[in-house]
Curated annotation (Swiss-Prot):
The keyword Mitochondrion does not apply. Pfam families: D-Glu_cyclase. InterPro entries: D-Glu_cyclase (IPR009906), Putative_hydro-lyase (IPR038021), UPF0317 (IPR016938). It comes from the Bacteria. It comes from Polaromonas sp. (strain JS666 / ATCC BAA-500). Keywords: Lyase. The keyword Lyase applies. This is Putative hydro-lyase Bpro_1776.
Length: 274
């Protein structure tokens, strides 16, 4: 079983770490249970929310009303564990490194396999993830500190409200990456090309303006240092639905664990708008 400090190369091997189907197969075997930042870097990654069918319509409307933090990549039929538009062999019950099981708005377990919990009424939503634009940032020569340090990205609950739908409501969660000023401008330009994976940032600069008191204490993920000559840049984040689930308190729900994403067969460049 992997840990966040263990090198991905020691588990996957240098030759296969960029092969999405191979990475999913290792995850399916339970050999990698950590975050997926930097894995299969050419491939689209997704946040996951799994809800009973009787609550799926409200959540679908929540995503439609909040496309910045909740850009939908795929929605399954009730009870279907496959998502053929995202991967031919994909099985949502086994192919995430770690899941969160929710009951009445509280996380009660974080298993690596949800096969025993699967039900015929469950609907899967896959939401775009900012890990998918990191390849473009790195190709442009922009440093990403969490990848350099083999950490999960830092994520925070902001004071930016989302548009409610049914019982689903709550604050926008944002991910943060520090850049020097010139690199921050370039990062805005690059990520604007990817609206299906959150697009351009929602804020840069003073974190207090969006309700973040201490960058060293993220609500999800791992803290990274922001150097004196750097600016924190914040993107809408697909963990936002988990904040909404905590407010809606559905009887039963499953999500990905923050940072432990679904790796798809889609290529990042396929989502570029221009």
């Amino acid at each position: 079983m992997s840990t966040s400090s263990e090198s991905a190369l020691s588990v996957f091997g240098a030759g296969d770490i960029n092969n999405a189907a191979y990475v999913r197969s290792i995850i399916r075997q339970g050999r990698w249970t950590s975050h997926t930042s930097g894995l299969a870097s050419e491939h689209v990654q997704g946040n996951v929310v799994i809800l009973p069918a009787d609550e799926a319509n409200d959540f679908l409307r929540y995503c439609q009303r909040n496309p910045k933090p909740c850009p939908l990549l795929a929605v399954s039929e009730p009870g279907h564990a496959g998502l053929p538009t995202l991967g031919a062999d994909l099985d949502i019950r086994t192919d995430l490194p770690r899941y969160r099981v929710w009951r009445h708005g509280e996380v009660v377990d974080e298993p690596a396999d949800i096969s025993a919990l699967w039900r015929k009424d469950l609907v899967t939503f896959v939401i775009g993830c900012s890990f998918s634009f990191e390849e473009a940032l790195m190709q442009a020569g922009l440093p990403l500190r969490h990848i350099e340090q083999q950490r999960n990205v830092a994520m925070y609950r902001s004071n930016i409200a989302t548009e409610p739908a049914g019982a689903f409501h709550g604050p926008m969660v944002v991910s943060m990456r520090p850049f020097k000023a010139s690199d921050a401008i370039r990062a805005i330009q690059i990520t604007s090309r990817f609206p299906d994976v959150h697009g351009a940032p929602v804020h840069m600069g003073d974190p207090a303006q969006i309700g973040i008191a201490d960058l060293a204490r993220p609500d999800y993920g791992d803290a990274v240092e922001v150097l004196p000559d750097e600016i924190p840049v914040f993107w809408a984040c697909g963990v936002t639905p988990q904040a909404a689930i905590a407010q809606a308190r559905p009887e039963f729900c499953i999500t990905h664990a923050p940072g432990a994403m679904l790796i798809t067969d889609l290529l990042n460049h396929q989502l570029a708008a221009f």
